[in-house]
Amino acid sequence: MENFSLLSISGPPISSSALSAFPDIMFSRATSLPDIAKTAVPTEASSPAQALPPQYQSIIVRQGIQNTALSPDCSLGDTQHGEKLRRNCTIYRPWFSPYSYFVCADKESQLEAYDFPEVQQDEGKWDNCLSEDMAENICSSSSSPENTCPREATKKSRHGLDSITSQDILMASRWHPAQQNGYKCVACCRMYPTLDFLKSHIKRGFREGFSCKVYYRKLKALWSKEQKARLGDRLSSGSCQAFNSPAEHLRQIGGEAYLCL
């Protein structure tokens, strides 16, 4: 992605590379950057965002960055790589920041500036690894050799464990105090007004740096294991009860039979 380097205008001394690129900075040591924007922005561009390359324009419009100060000659005092940096490097300042930032990008980052495929690929890899681990745990839990765990069954189990439904979210929040203003994410403790917002946060929170989807999947896998354990206990105790009912019937008839000792 983009490489950001901070250019300080007030405070610590400015590096020699920045001074060689912007010689007017020494004469305008101000706390804000409007003066630098006047000297750096070319007069041909009607707005700062128009001077950016197309990939940076989409990033600025998407992130809401305004009052952008640019410099077409971002050579940074390097004669060997000056042409490369002049093509791939720009400078801008967000409206909420007292600093200006160098943005240097290569061809790979230009291709990734629109859809962020790395994040989607990492998310897909993480999801696939997690579902495969769950499927392996399910297959290893069956001890009988006749249970071969076919692929269709594992695909169904993966789909059931991967999908987080509204019932799963409400079940996870059952042990927490009831919220009156909305729905609370059990993983990150953030509040959302509706259940749909919470579901979209769990589904797409990986792009924002949250791992709530992984937490809910682990929780759902634990629930499935507990449910299987309880079902096994009921079957083991139900074998005795199944034999008790005909024994009681025989006792009523007059015979004595103890089928479950």
UniProtKB/Swiss-Prot annotation:
Keyword entries, A-Z: Differentiation, Membrane, Nucleus, Spermatogenesis
UniProt protein name: Spermatogenesis-associated protein 46
Originating species: Homo sapiens (Human)
Primary site of residence: nucleus
Annotated stretches, region: Disordered: 140-159
Function summary: Plays a role in spermiogenesis and fertilization.
Domain of life: Eukaryota
Cellular localization per UniProt: Nucleus membrane
Database matches in InterPro entries: Spt46-like
Signal peptide: none
Gene Ontology CC: nuclear membrane
GO terms for biological process, alphabetical: cell differentiation; fertilization; fusion of sperm to egg plasma membrane involved in single fertilization; spermatogenesis
PANTHER family xref list: PROTEIN FAM170B-RELATED, SPERMATOGENESIS-ASSOCIATED PROTEIN 46
Tissue: Testis-specific.
Pfam families in UniProt: Spt46
